[in-house]
Amino acid sequence: MGQETEAVGQMEKLLALFAAERMKSLAAPEVQALVECWKQYITAYHYNCTDEILSALGQMYASDERFAQNIDRFGQGTARFMSGAIAFYCSR
């Protein structure tokens, strides 16, 4: 499996996990651990993901319709939930 295929598979796995957790509190330890996994995923496959970059990405996931639609394929409201969870993570 190539690195790009691996990256897409990992991304989809994480997005599915965000979708599965979307009814939980943004502050729930398992949700915040998932945000940390997302940050590590971006660093491993794309670029060094600082909290500042992560915060900007989180805002974009909910505000940019293209991102929101793609993320919400995993479950309606996942993009907004993910954005909120990232904002909570970055505010600590």
PLM features per residue range, with description:
Residues M1-R92:
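Amphipathic alpha-helical "stalk" segments
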